[in-house]
Amino acid sequence: MFKICKYVIYDILRSKVLIAYMLFLLAISFSLFALGDDTAKTIVSLMSVVLIIVPLISIVFSTTYFYNSYEFLELLVAQPISRRSLLLGEYAGVALSLVVVFLVGIGIPVCLYAPNSTGAMLVLSGTALTLTFVSLAFFASVATRDKARGIGLSLLLWFYFAILYDAIVLIILFSFNDYPLDKAVIALASLNPIDLSRILLLMKMDIAALMGFTGAVYKHFFGTMYGLFYSCGLLLLWIVLPVIICARMFARKDL
């Protein structure tokens, strides 16, 4: 497993696509910090990159890499190594590579310009989202053998969590605004890793008051230490659960 992980990391870090992704993050981060006088506003701008661009690149790159290395996986399956270890090694290599690139592209500028708790939360949220969407990418890739369908499913998952889910939540809130929705709002936020990361950042920036009723509910629950542990626990679950499911699927899959 560790040898596979090491090989994957070495292979990915030479990828021109990943180098371009890292340079893009560095350029965006340094540009925003250089042009903005207020670091808090710059963090808000970077939050959009972390919540939208980072999950998109993570899930698309991971899916593409998995299918491109499928013949390599088929070769290793014939060796005396368990399929579960093979898949976990592949996942660890891809995930660690993308995390390293994110930490260089976003983490270094944040450490230089915003070395505070808000900056740390931005980096931690981005790292969690990177791992989450790599997990979802592997789930989509193992679920279907066809590369086009796998990439399509990955893009559909990203579109659902990044854009469509918020629209569905708004429709639910407007449709049932005459009913007490405190617990429902928390439950709906728990079902989306991007929303969880956004809430953690908003709580750190203390701008929940600008969000009205929803912000008050978030502040009351997620603003507490219990809410923080709850959010981190759910994000960890979003990372681990898809990997466990796809590892079991891969172990039984007919290659």
Q: Which residues does each predicted region cover?
A:
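Selective transmembrane-helix segments that form parts of the transport pathway or gating/packing helices
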Residues: R83-G119
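A structural motif at transmembrane helix-loop-helix junctions in multipass membrane proteins
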Residues: T130-N177
